[in-house]
Amino acid sequence: RDRSVSRGLGDVYKRQGVKHLTLARCPMTDVVKEILEDRQALEELTGEIVCGHAYPNGSYSPEIKTLLPSLGIHYARIATDTGLYTHPQDFYEWNPTCHHNNRLMYHAKEFLSFDLPQFQYLFYVWGHSYEFDRDNNWYVIEEFCKMIGGREDIWYATNAEVCHYLMAVKQVHTSVDEKLLFNGSGQDIYLIRNGENILLHPGELFR
């Protein structure tokens, strides 16, 4: 795929702690308790594995980032808009493109104008559903969905789906002459090679 959108607004399983504490000010024992108790509660509620985190109040530290993988967390979002459409360099310090109140339609139009699939643009919108009632602006997300929805050249994905796919891409191995491709991951991988669209199934060797 040449573009992707992360559904920050619809990703209800990303957790922010039991008490929404400012984690960088807490002892690490409290951080562990906050994350694991909230994970367990959400998993019991949804019947799914919760592997994402959003830093409450945007608060984190290098120590907290180092801790997260051992707690089953694969990625963590910060609330700092970048205005960019790039992949995260660090999944534990994942900055979105924009909040839904921050020039959303401008970013949508800019995103749709891109035509260089090799860059694999990522448009990440974040926000909270309660804000639409508070600000009386449901029309903002409705207009956005009308503009950007229903397109075949966009992959509409959750944070976890983007994270796991990009991790899987790193498990594609090539021969020195690039004639052989092997998908060592457990999911389908989409590639473009010499203008040809290639679908690599899990464990497949492409010749």
Functional labels for PLM-detected ranges:
Residues R1-I64, P69-H74, D81-C98, Y121-S129:
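Metal-dependent polysaccharide deacetylase catalytic core of the NodB/CE4 family, i.e.
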Residues E43-E44, Y75-T86, K109, Y124-F206:
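C-terminal domain-boundary segment and adjacent tail
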Residues H99-F114:
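A Trp-anchored, charged/polar loop motif used as the substrate-binding/catalytic surface
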